[in-house]
Curated annotation (Swiss-Prot):
InterPro entries (UniProt xref): Ribosomal_uL13, Ribosomal_uL13_bac-type, Ribosomal_uL13_sf
HAMAP family: Ribosomal_uL13
Protein family per UniProt: Belongs to the universal ribosomal protein uL13 family.
Assembly information from the UniProt record: Part of the 50S ribosomal subunit.
Organism in which the protein naturally occurs: Mycoplasma capricolum subsp. capricolum (strain California kid / ATCC 27343 / NCTC 10154)
Entry GO CC: cytosolic large ribosomal subunit
Stored Pfam families: Ribosomal_L13
Described function: This protein is one of the early assembly proteins of the 50S ribosomal subunit, although it is not seen to bind rRNA by itself. It is important during the early stages of 50S assembly.
GO molecular function, one term: structural constituent of ribosome
The name this protein goes by in its record: Large ribosomal subunit protein uL13
Length: 151
């Protein structure tokens, strides 16, 4: 009778992937990147072990939103002081720091615990096509652009 194999933290080989966000919808890109960060694309996925891979996202400023979200979607945060609610539209955020748009979308799709924060550290988002991780020899990760189109 076969036993279920359980992986351990010392047996994990993390790969590096690179994703080009140019003309990709933010939500579809974020869900597929979050799956790779969690390791759910692997056959030996184990919920209590962080066996996700590193993901480099380039051209973050060229990611798109569908519909009128560029002007109608807002990011909120509060300073915890009376009257301290701040809001910023996507277009304003894109001018200030476009990498934060993708970072926030992906972070909110990861677990809200210690393991989720460790998986979030494996995300590297860059404005433009230059990145300092060429030595890791990242593989290109194809992101599907249509609903139901899984590659």
């Amino acid at each position: 009778m076969k036993q279920t194999t359980m992986i351990s933290a010392k047996n994990i080989n993390k790969k590096w992937y690179i994703v080009d966000a140019e003309n990709k919808t933010v939500g579809r890109l974020a869900t597929q990147v979050a799956l790779v960060l969690r390791g759910k694309h692997k056959v030996d996925f184990t919920p209590h072990i962080n066996n996700g891979d590193h993901v480099i996202v380039i051209n973050a400023e060229k990611a798109i939103f569908s519909g009128k979200k560029e002007s109608n979607k807002f990011y909120y945060h509060h300073s915890m002081h009376p009257g301290g609610l701040k809001k910023r539209s996507v277009s304003v955020q894109r001018e200030l720091d476009p990498t934060k748009i993708l970072e926030r979308a992906i972070r909110l799709m990861l677990p809200k615990n210690v393991q989720g924060s460790n998986q979030y550290r494996a995300l590297h988002v860059f404005k433009g096509s230059e990145h300092p991780y060429a030595a890791q020899k990242p593989e290109v990760l194809e992101i599907s652009t249509k609903k139901g189109d899984v590659k």
